[in-house]
């Protein structure tokens, strides 16, 4: 995976889910999931399972941005979550023998409970996961410098063409 700073990083540990979802760059057709698997000690034979989870999470995050529902993605994550075991150790809930994909699921489920999940979204333009820091949760771009600027420039040009006609 590339060494990069996310324009709008999620707080830890949700940032790990954000990095996992961003293990593909659709705009430049780059696949970083094999590196993610290696970095987290998983064999390459887990690629299909990891890619399916990543795309299910991406679909759920896209809904945060555009509305609607993603029933197939929800069903996939629910099924994958059944394999994640937690234990109570004293006052703390911990994962019991979960692999890194199980940890991604557990963090996502925890974020759903603590309210941070709905702030993690997928950019309408480039499909990059970003954390919405706006007060009213209305952010729709990964960053103003990247997609926001592109889309505003495109809209401006469209308006100018319409006014000139």
Descriptions of predicted regions:
Residues 133-134, 145:
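Short beta->alpha connector loops at strand-helix junctions that form conserved
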Residues 132-133, 153:
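Short, non-ligating residues that shape and space the ligands of small metal-coordination modules
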Residues 126-127, 136-142:
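Cys/His-rich short segments
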Residues 145-164:
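Basic DNA-binding region of bZIP-type proteins
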Residues 120, 139, 144, 150:
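Residues immediately within or flanking Cys/His clusters that coordinate Zn2+
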Residues 1-131, 165:
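Short helix-coil boundary/hinge micro-motifs
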């Amino acid at each position: 995976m590339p060494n990069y700073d996310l324009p709008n990083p999620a707080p830890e540990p949700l940032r790990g889910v954000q990095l996992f979802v961003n293990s593909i760059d659709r705009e430049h057709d780059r696949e970083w999931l094999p590196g993610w698997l290696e970095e987290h000690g998983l064999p390459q034979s887990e690629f299909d399972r990891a890619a399916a989870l990543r795309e299910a999470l991406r679909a759920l995050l896209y809904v945060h941005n555009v509305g609607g529902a993603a029933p197939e993605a929800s069903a996939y994550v629910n099924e994958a979550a059944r394999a994640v075991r937690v234990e109570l150790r004293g006052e703390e809930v911990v994962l019991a023998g979960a692999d890194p994909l199980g940890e991604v699921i557990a963090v996502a489920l925890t974020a759903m409970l603590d309210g941070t999940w709905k702030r993690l979204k997928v950019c309408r333009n480039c499909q990059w996961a970003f954390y919405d820091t706006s007060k009213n949760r209305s952010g729709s771009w990964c960053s103003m410098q990247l997609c926001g600027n592109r889309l505003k420039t495109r809209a401006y040009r469209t308006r100018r063409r319409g006014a000139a006609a």
